[in-house]
Amino acid sequence: MLFRKLGLASALTLGLAGGALAQTMGIATNPQGSLYYAVGSAISQVVSNKTKHSLRVQPMGGSSTYVPTINQGQVEFGLLNVIDPAFAWEGVENFKGQPPAKNLRLVAVIFQLPIGIAVLDNAPYKTLADLKGVRMPAEFTAQSTIRFVQDTVLANAGLSTDDMQKVPVRDYVQGMRLLGEKRVDAALMGVGAAQAQEVNAKLQSEGGIRFLNLVDTPEAAKRMHQIMPAYPYLQQPSSAIPGVKAGGATLMTYSAFIVSSSHIADDVVYDVAKTVHGNAKELAASHGSLRRFNPDRMSEVHKVEWHPGAIKFYKEIGQWPPKAPK
């Protein structure tokens, strides 16, 4: 059932007449088994347990499938990375052929997605700049967003996928597997991802995988930001994160968002933002990726508009207007 602005009065009337009936809302995610599905499940549980609202995860085929339903108010919330809202807003790239999603609104930065480019540990490549001309996954026909993510990492060193020997793949998971099979020389990898752990185990005779460091300078950051808003960060070594050697590795991070639409009532979005902010520990306990949720940085500069209900809450806690990460 929908919780649109037009239906708010009738929903409240039903609540009063029926003993505060909960209005069931949806949060759209990628398919069951995906990272976004797990995160969406955690968010829906916290919101349902801590507010008068009932929120249920709704897995779909992918962002290009569920963004139109959010834009039209058919689903109240969803999870998107930092690039998808901008593409959907303009109707380009993986949203080409769809009307611009001008009703889309941002609600919260929910966690950071850490990623980097890895090579075999015994490979001769020591820096990203050393990768020019090597074999790398390309095209990402089923996951076009990843093309921009990979080029953003490479832009840190003044490179792009066009500087490489391109090996066409469907998605970045296939690219990681090709590194494990030594059919590419370097591949984009999610930090601590299950597939990265599998590839690392497969390459133990070569010492496993090794992430290449990004350069943390204003000039390098400027090159990255010409493609997408992403930032270098220092990842400390951990037994759960293969490829990060002693002393840590400077990798890339970018944001994942809770999104909604202009159809959804301000007080509903306010409640969701406030509840997520106040339950960081519960969220972190529910899924490892939500340990990267920072309640002190829930807003971020973006070309897509923020929902008024979210803005109201961020003004109350001193997070509006949003600031770029340091």
List each language-model region with its residue ranges.
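Periplasmic-binding protein-like
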Residues: 276-293
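Bacterial N-terminal signal peptides that target proteins for export
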Residues: 1-10
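Pocket-flanking alpha-helical
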Residues: 39-45, 58-98, 117, 173-178, ...
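Ligand-binding pocket segment of bilobal, Venus flytrap-like solute-binding proteins
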Residues: 67, 76, 163-228, 311
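Bilobed "Venus flytrap"/periplasmic-binding protein-like clamshell domains
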Residues: 24-50, 54-56, 113-181, 300, ...
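A structural signal for short loop-to-beta-strand junctions that line the ligand-binding cleft
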Residues: 97-110, 239-249
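Sec/Tat signal peptide C-region and signal peptidase I cleavage site
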Residues: 16-22
